[in-house]
């Protein structure tokens, strides 16, 4: 019974270490800065939409309101 506990404790300890190393490796990959996060992608999409579409949309609305088309 005691050897079983030692074996389980050893497996738990080794598993904890390997999980910790995997997490560190994953964090190191994320620090590269090469991949954009979801939030950055959303911001860029919103910015592109504002810069490209809204001025045209406002021109169309003004054109229809004032019948200057």
Swiss-Prot record:
InterPro entries in alphabetical order: EF_Hand_1_Ca_BS, Frog_antimicrobial_propeptide
Disulfide bond entries: 63-69
Signal peptide: 1-18
Biological process terms in GO annotation: defense response to bacterium; killing of cells of another organism
Organism domain of life: Eukaryota
UniProt main location, coarse: secreted
Cellular compartments annotated: Secreted
Name the UniProt record assigns to this protein: Pleurain-A1
Higher taxonomy: Eukaryota, Metazoa, Chordata, Craniata, Vertebrata
